Amino acid sequence: MNFQAGGGQSPQQQQQLAGGPPQQFALSNSAAIRAEIQRFESVHPNIYAIYDLIERIEDLALQNQIREHVISIEDSFVNSQEWTLSRSVPELKVGIVGNLSSGKSALVHRYLTGTYVQEESPEGGRFKKEIVVDGQSYLLLIRDEGGPPELQFAAWVDAVVFVFSLEDEISFQTVYNYFLRLCSFRNASEVPMVLVGTQDAISAANPRVIDDSRARKLSTDLKRCTYYETCATYGLNVERVFQDVAQKVVALRKKQQLAIGPCKSLPNSPSHSAVSAASIPAVHINQATNGGGSAFSDYSSSVPSTPSISQRELRIETIAASSTPTPIRKQSKRRSNIFTSRKGADLDREKKAAECKVDSIGSGRAIPIKQGILLKRSGKSLNKEWKKKYVTLCDNGLLTYHPSLHDYMQNIHGKEIDLLRTTVKVPGKRLPRATPATAPGTSPRANGLSVERSNTQLGGGTGAPHSASSASLHSERPLSSSAWAGPRPEGLHQRSCSVSSADQWSEATTSLPPGMQHPASGPAEVLSSSPKLDPPPSPHSNRKKHRRKKSTGTPRPDGPSSATEEAEESFEFVVVSLTGQTWHFEASTAEERELWVQSVQAQILASLQGCRSAKDKTRLGNQNAALAVQAVRTVRGNSFCIDCDAPNPDWASLNLGALMCIECSGIHRHLGAHLSRVRSLDLDDWPPELLAVMTAMGNALANSVWEGALGGYSKPGPDACREEKERWIRAKYEQKLFLAPLPSSDVPLGQQLLRAVVEDDLRLLVMLLAHGSKEEVNETYGDGDGRTALHLSSAMANVVFTQLLIWYGVDVRSRDARGLTPLAYARRAGSQECADILIQHGCPGEGCGLAPTPNREPANGTNPSAELHRSPSLL
């Protein structure tokens, strides 16, 4: 059955699509408030009931462990975002809907953790993540809905992502049904929407059944929303989906603020009147411990750089142009030609129409702040011919160009220029410095610098001399003149341009007439008024003019008397790097060139400011490191040396997790790194994984193990001689004379170690590692399993346990029965910190890539994390 979305709606459905939600579905604020109060007040009675049940547990150790977990849950509830998050932190609320076959859970999991999980979550989930839009951080609330959209869901969301599987017809039909249901509760024009088709389940046994035309037809029926095809297995377009939907929400909010009028008291994040019991997000295990790429840096690899103030002001006019256009608009853009001859009102009208079309282009990616068709002089051929290029300027400091609009949309054959290492020049004049406001006399920015950021990563062609990837560019600073100051000395004009042809020579050597102060006065006017300075005839110049006429496709009269030809051939600007590389571009009008030049200058300024802010972040990082070291000092027992009780110790033993005085640290160094890894608390660097170990342990915990059986011995004091301290330290750590005894058990030490990891018992783990041999600490979970304690700690994303196990000799290269290393478990658990530790110590990564294919999963569909949940019962 071929499903035709949008066809055959009932009158009621048509009314819902056109006029918004019926009145009877209006959500009562009073009822929502009462429901939220009831939900909130019901939490603590249930927690107190759990405490009463805990008291009935006879095993005191188990009782204390459960109590600690409940206390942690209670603290997390009491300190939820509604009570602690600053009012200045804006939120973006995104709902994900689709049936169980859509692949939406895998899409969300890939975005949050960078890994692929095949199972679909029937109950959905609630997740949080930081996302950056236009240089500002937002708290992204992701609500994976387990069923169709309900009234409370519709009132909560800022945007909706509809998900279906390209190999499942039912999931495709479900999308439109869910859309109609959403429209019955909420006006569709108020909610940005994105349609996603997932490729995860496509295989030889499950071929694709939804072709591209049907999917795009559905996206048109869904209020012309953007359509993406994603693959959670390899991460295709996953990041782009969430970045795009966030940009749509931000753009819609700014558009609504502009519609209200200028008001400085507007809140950063609009509040919704509906609050319900289901709006408290739950914590996901893979979300809590991810600290990598990146932490969350990898997930935010498309984070935009800090935009300049001038860009924000200039982009206000077309802030609504944030959604990716439909294929109809793309086709109409291809038929336009902005280089045709125009006169009078027709010129202005057609120019604005062409610019509107250009600014609305963007297939499946964020809209650049400026884009359009320019002529670019080739740097490869001998004749230096001019060719049309589709040029885009993004707020990440990159200027990109493609042979055609089609290549740009397909993201192929593109080259990029890093503006941080360049400057922009106009042959024949010295440019003013970029300023936030529009220069007087220039035309309005009809191109409307859009707020949206481009996440596109363009692959530069190899061997092109103008490709930014072909050389390391060191830029020249932008010109520092703040305004056009009239005629300048001739020498300054000579230095402000790149002389490479007869035409450029004429522009570079021409002096401006007195009184000409406006920067929009192009070199063409100077040339036409100064015939004495024309250069000698050059065959290269004639060929250049001929090629330009040919490339524009518009016949023009030849001869020096044609002012139109001279004007159209002189709107050139050059991007120059300090290494001597040049990129020559030409616009169709002087106004368009001014827009491009000022936009490029603004991006150069923003890139330079971004470098300065990076230094500020480094300084701030040093302050944070000092605070972290201070946190280590405040750990229980760390006020005194672990061996001699000297006050205020400032040296540390990493694998012991303890602090010591400088004299004892010298003795520890002689023990060897296999017994004590010494580091200065103030002079050395402290990466996060080492700080985690030090703050988790401390002198009190360490001495409860290493001095757990002192008997009649007494430890030396701060004033004891060095020989006495050394005898004590060697007896304590080398001979292990005072080591606390192991608890009586028939279970082998290696199996106890596995249990300690699963039960998250740090003191028992340290004791077992101190007693165990290398063979015992490397004992596996079972003969047919092959997992070591390091596999389990990596699967639990436990950074402290992972680091301690490696220090005490657990083999990082060990593999389980399926050939997976601990690194594979860490990556599947979404822990970048554990993965970094394992890689640093030589854990192999083959067979455990970031995007495992579905056939690497077990036959029963489980993964290591799921097996881990059964580990306590198996142990």
Curated annotation (Swiss-Prot):
Ways its activity is controlled: GTPase activity is stimulated by oxidative stress.
Bias kind Basic residues: ranges: 541-551
Keyword DNA damage found: no
GLD domain ranges (all copies): 87-261
Tissues in which the protein is found: Widely expressed.
GO biological process, any: regulation of postsynaptic membrane neurotransmitter receptor levels
Segments annotated as ANK repeats: 748-777, 785-814, 818-847
Region of interest: Small GTPase-like: 84-375
Modified positions (Phosphothreonine) in chain numbering: 324, 326
UniProt region (Disordered), positions on chain: 1-23, 428-568, 853-875
Residues bound to GTP: 98-105, 142-146, 198-201
Top-level taxon of origin: Eukaryota
Family named by the database record: Belongs to the centaurin gamma-like family.
PANTHER family: ARF-GAP WITH GTPASE, ANK REPEAT AND PH DOMAIN-CONTAINING PROTEIN 3 (PTHR45819:SF2), CENTAURIN-GAMMA-1A (PTHR45819)
Quaternary structure note: Interacts with PML. Interacts with expanded polyglutamine proteins.
Protein name: Arf-GAP with GTPase, ANK repeat and PH domain-containing protein 3
Species whose genome carries this gene: Homo sapiens
Gene: AGAP3
